[in-house]
Amino acid sequence: MMGMALELSVLGRSVIDSKTLNLKRYGQKSKLSGRFLPRAELHCPVALSSSKHSNLSFRFRRSCEFSYRSRFMLFSSSQCHEGSQRKSDSGEKELESIKVLLKRGIVIGALVCGVFLYGCQKVLASAGVVEAGYEVFGQSVVLFKNALPKIYQVLTVLREQGLILAALLSLSAFFSMAETSITTLWPWKVRELAEKEPENGVFRMLRSDVTRFLTTILIGTTVVNIAATALVTEAATAIFGEAGVSAATGLMTVAILLLTEITPKSVAVHNAQEVARIVVRPVAWLSLVLYPVGRIVTYLSMGILKILGLKGRSEPYVTEDELKLMLRGAELSGAIEEEEQDMIENVLEIKDTHVREVMTPLVDVVAIDASASLVDFHSMWVTHQYSRVPVFEQRIDNIVGIAYAMDLLDYVQKGDLLESTSVGDMAHKPAYFVPDSMSVWNLLREFRIRKVHMAVVLNEYGGTIGIVTLEDVVEEIVGEIFDENDSKEEIQKKTGYIVMRDEGIYDVDANTSIDQLSEELNMKMPEGIQYETVSGFVCEAFGYIPKTGESVKVVLEKESWEEDGEEEEGKQERQEPKEKNQIYRVEILAGNARKVSAVRFERVNDMDQVSEASDVKSMVPKFVRKWSSEEDDGNLSNEEDQSENAVLDEHVLADNSKKQQ
C-alpha cells in the first residue's frame, strides 16, 4: 500500500503516473484520496475527495507538483521490510522537517517585512500571500539558475582583468589621498614644515612648486578613472550586451565614490601631514612624465580664460575671513586662548577702525591755557598726573601745542622760577593734527615715524573734536589699559559701566558703547552714524539733550529674532509685535546742559501700554529717513510714512511729559 502526505508548498516539477492515491494530510491522521490526470513533465489538474482509506498499488516517483502548487510526499505501507521502512521514513521525515522549517521561516520573514512596510491589516487581508511568497521564492531560484552562466563569465573576466582593475582603482585612491593631503595643508604650514627639513625634504619639494604636484595629480586621476571605467564597460558589454553599459555605470559610480574618493580623502583629511610625507615623492617621480602634458593643458586653459576675459591667480592666498576661521578653530581646539584670538582679530580690523572711534572727545579733554604759569601746570599734574597735556590759546578748541610733564621736572632741576615761566614757553609746537576719518593703522604708523604719542583730531570743517594718544591705539588691540593711579571714577568714565539694580532694571553710564549695552540687554539697539554710545542713543530718542529726571519709552527688537536668519522672516512678520519686541523706559539719572552722564533702563512688561498711551508720538531715527528718501525722491512723504511702518522695531516712542528733578 502506498500513500502520500499533502503539504501546501512550492517545489520542483515532477509527475506521478497513477490516477488515484492514498493521501495523508501532513501533520494529521486522516487520509484523503486523490484523482488526477497525469501528463509527462507537465502540471496536471487534480481533484481531491475525502475518504477514509483507498489502497492502490502503482509505480511512482518520490514527489510531484500540480497546477495547484500542491506537493505530495509518497510513503509505502506494504511490500517493504518493516525495519528498513522505518529507517527510510525516519530519514525522509527529518529531511522534510528541515525543509518545512526553512520554508516556514521564509514565509514568516516575508510576513514580518510586509507588516512593517504595508501594515498588519493589508498583509493579512492580501489573498494568497503565502502562495505569492512561495512563487517569488521559486522564481528567484529559477532566475539564479539561469544567471549561473553569466556569473561564470563574470568570474572569468575578473580572473583575467581583476588585477588590472584593482591596480587602476588603487592608483585613483592614491591620487585622491595625495590631492586632499596637499590642499588641506595651508601654504604657511607647508613653509613651516619645509624649514625643519633638509634640502631634499618632501615639503621643500612641495613648497618649491605646488602647482606641479596638483597638475600631475589631476592628470593621473583623470586617466586612471577613465581607464577603469572603460575596462569595466567593455567587459560588461561583452557579457550582458547593451544592458552592460548601465550596469558598468552604476558599478563604477559606487566603486569610485566609495573606494577612490570618500574613503581615501577622509583618511587624508585627518592625517594630512603623514599622508603628504608618503605621497609627495612618488608624485614628484610621476610628474617627470605627466607634468609636460599638464603644461600643455595649462596653456590651453589660460588661452580660454584670456578669450573669456578672465584672469587666473598664480599663487594661492589666505583671505582675512579664512584667517579668522582658522583663529576660531584654533581657539576651540585649545591651541590659543580666547584673549589671544581677540587680539589677533583686533589687529586684522584695525585698518577699518577710524580715529573718531578711539579718540577722547574734546568735552573730556584736560588741557591748560598757554598763558598759565608752570606752577599751575604743576598743580594740574599733581591732580591728574597726565604725562602730556594739550595747550590752548584763548579757547580750548584752539590747541597750539603739547606740554610734557618731563619738561616741567627739567625746569625744577635748573632752579628757574616756575611762576615767571608760562606753559606756552615750554610747550612743543605745533601740535600734530589728524582728521577724524584717518584709520588707526595709519595713525600708528605716523606715531612711529614722527615719534609722538599724542595728536589733535579735527573734523571735516577743521574744528577740534578731541585728542588721540598712542595708548588709545594700543588699547584697540590689547584692550583697556589702566595704571596704578587711575581712580574708580576715571575707570568708569573711560570704559563705561552697566549695573543691574533689579530684575529688568539697569543703570548705565552714558559713555558705554551701544554694542556693550546691546549684548547686556540681549536687544537689538539701533545704530547709526550719529552716535556710538548710550548718550548719543538717548539724545537721538529725545531729539534734544534731556535734563535729569526726564524719561522716554523705546521699543527695541529682541536680539534672538535677528539671529533666526532669513528663513524665519515670513514667520516673524506674522507674529505680534509684543512677541518679538520689548519696551524699555529710559530715565536720565545725571547730566548737564551739554551732555548726559548716566541713564537707567527699566524693562516694561506690559506691551499694551504702547497702544493705551495717547500722548506718545512715534519718532524715526534720522538715518532711517535719509535711507528712505534716497529710494524715491519724487514721493518723499509717502516713502517716509512707509519707512516708519517698516522699521517699527527701531521706532522710539517719546513721552511728552517731562519729569523735573
From Swiss-Prot:
Pfam family, one: CBS
Keywords: CBS domain, Chloroplast, Membrane, Plastid, Repeat, Transit peptide, Transmembrane, Transmembrane helix, Transport
CNNM transmembrane domain ranges (all copies): 154-340
Membrane topology: Multi-pass membrane protein
A GO MF label: flavin adenine dinucleotide binding
Keyword Transport in record: yes
Chief place where the protein resides: plastid
SMART domains the UniProt entry points to: CBS (SM00116), CorC_HlyC (SM01091)
Transmembrane segments: 105-125, 162-182, 213-233, 239-259, 285-305
Transit pept. (range): 1-71
Subcellular location: Plastid, Chloroplast membrane
GO cellular component, one term: chloroplast envelope
Bias type Basic and acidic residues, positions: 648-661
Taxonomy, superkingdom: Eukaryota
Signal peptide limits: none
Biased amino acid composition, Acidic residues: 560-570, 630-643
Span list, region Disordered: 559-578, 628-661
Domain CBS, chain residue ranges per copy: 359-420, 426-484
Xref: CDD domains: CBS_pair_CorC_HlyC_assoc
PROSITE patterns according to UniProt: CBS, CNNM
Protein name: Putative DUF21 domain-containing protein At3g13070, chloroplastic
Natural source organism: Arabidopsis thaliana
Gene: CBSDUFCH1
